[in-house]
Amino acid sequence: LPICPSGAVNCQVSLRDLFDRAVILSHYIHNLSSEMFNEFDKRYAQGRGFITKAIDSCHTSSLQTPEDKEQAQQIHHEVLVSLILGVLRSWNDPLYHLVTEVRGMQEAPDAILSRAIQIEEENKRLLEGMEKIVGQVHPGVKENEVYSVWSGLPSLQMADEDTRLFAFYDLLHCLRRDSHKIDSYLKLLKCRIIYNSNC
């Protein structure tokens, strides 16, 4: 569902509609990333002990994101909006490479590839929607494009199968974690900004 019909000039969408769409999208992305992680885990990670190796060192860890709802509630909504944008931007590059590398996998399972493609597309749409929200909540504010650089591509291309599969596992684990955070923060923001915290 495009936010504005193509060719529409001065199209205005209410802030509530923008938030509704963003929450639906973020929830969908989180569901897809959970399904993709579970599929990968079932197909490639069984018996390899990846879960014990998956230290919580996602490339987005440098962005100081709140760990839970209680922490998130202490953060001013402007900061929360910036964090969401930062996390979304931080995934542009890894999602692009994830799709490319999954395509190159032997017998790349469609269940994983199709979800990776969808998540990459939906992440861009959610980022676009968030930028529109920022435009309405803080008109005229120049947004700092803060994001974390991902340097995990060489690991996804390793010749050693175990190392390579673990790199995929770790990336999908982080994607699931971050998509859950974004989903939670967005619901919190919608409650705060649209419903004046009465929800």
Swiss-Prot record:
Subcellular location: Secreted
Residues with Phosphoserine modification: 26, 34, 90
Disulfide bonds: 4-11, 58-174, 191-199
Alphabetized Pfam families for the sequence: Hormone_1
Keywords: Disulfide bond, Hormone, Lactation, Phosphoprotein, Secreted
GO terms of molecular function: hormone activity; prolactin receptor binding
UniProt-listed GO biological process terms: female pregnancy; lactation; positive regulation of cell population proliferation; positive regulation of lactation; positive regulation of receptor signaling pathway via JAK-STAT; response to nutrient levels
Gene Ontology CC, one term: extracellular space
Function: Prolactin acts primarily on the mammary gland by promoting lactation.
Family: Belongs to the somatotropin/prolactin family.
Complexes and interactors: Interacts with PRLR.
Protein name (database record): Prolactin
Organism this protein belongs to: Balaenoptera borealis (Sei whale)
Gene symbol of the encoding locus: PRL
